[in-house]
Amino acid sequence: MATYGNETVDNYLYSSYNPYYYKYPKFKGWRQKAYFTNYGEGETYFDNHHRAQLKSILSQINPNLTPRLRKANTKDVGVQVNPKTDASIQCSLGPRTLLARKRDALRRRRQEVQTPGSPVSSGGVRFPRTQAVYSPVESRRLVSLFREEGEEEEDTDLEVTETVDSAEKLESAEKNVRKQGKKSAKQPLSPEKNINKQTETNEENTNEPVKTEQDDLKSKARVRFQSLEQKYGFYHCKDCNLRWESAYVWCVQGTNKVYFKQFCRTCQKSFNPYRVEDIACQTCKKARCTCSVKSRHVDPKRPHRQDLCGRCKGKRLSCDSTFSFKYII
């Protein structure tokens, strides 16, 4: 009898097992060891699992290493290698082809539609897109939010929309002219009606530029950023029957909308002022007093004293004698 060593080299290259799992014949004294039925023994299964993995790796490197196995291609052979499932379930697909996805079909179409002279695409390889630094949306700089830099981008967008709108208007105007021509051919208008129509069209044309100018002014008048400005407020607590004035009222710029509430000194309830004024001198009506004769000494370290000049003159608690300026009773 010939031994394994005397056999040809081809028998050594070909594997002595079928890559697709089949049930081995069981001997007479065999018993079910595992809890789950229809599952093979662990040792034989893991051995087959490692062999299948090795086969798939070798077939990807060089198909000549495993001539019985077909070239590894997920579209032709779908073999799931998972130690938790049985080999018979893993290889149940066999040589059946898998359904192509929509992405693959789209990529093939794009490759076929490529224009002559264009560079050859890299075979459907996908790379992650980087965010453009110059993109106004993705830019995180504060400067990109200002109106001056955003005007160019808005102008380009407006130009595109205007061109589309103008093209649509031209088409609709041509259609209207054709319809009017047909109607006029059928029913000639009297000279009075012609004059009235001409005046109406002239009025509409004159009103359109006025509206566009107003819209431009409104868009420019919009404030992008609403910062806070300091104002002078008058407060009143009904529970404590207490009134106080404060120069620390923070309002939204250009409005009297109070941003922060203030607390009463005794009951600590939050209040909004019942009246808000701009911080200005009562005599010269300016934020910084320009009066020749000032009612008191101006301390540059405490600018609110200067802002409140002439407001509490002659009162029991004046700015000069009060150290805390948050609550001026």
From Swiss-Prot:
Which GO molecular function entries does the Swiss-Prot or TrEMBL record give? mRNA binding; translation repressor activity; zinc ion binding
What Pfam families does the database record attribute to this sequence? Answer: Zn_ribbon_3CxxC
Top-level taxon in the UniProt lineage: Eukaryota
Decide whether keyword GTP-binding is in the record.
Answer: no
A GO CC term attached to the entry: cytoplasmic ribonucleoprotein granule
Segments forming 3CxxC-type zinc fingers: 231-314
Acidic residues bias located where?
A: 149-162
Query: What compartments host this protein?
Result: Cytoplasm, Cytoplasmic ribonucleoprotein granule
Protein family (similarity comment): Belongs to the ZAR1 family.
Its biological function? mRNA-binding protein required for maternal mRNA storage, translation and degradation during oocyte maturation. Probably promotes formation of some phase-separated membraneless compartment that stores maternal mRNAs in oocytes: acts by undergoing liquid-liquid phase separation upon binding to maternal mRNAs. Binds to the 3'-UTR of zona pellucida mRNAs, inhibiting their translation.
UniProt cross-references to PANTHER family, sorted A to Z? ZYGOTE ARREST PROTEIN 1, ZYGOTE ARREST PROTEIN 1-LIKE ISOFORM X1
Indicate what this protein is called per its UniProt record. Answer: Zygote arrest protein 1
Q: Give the originating organism.
A: Danio rerio
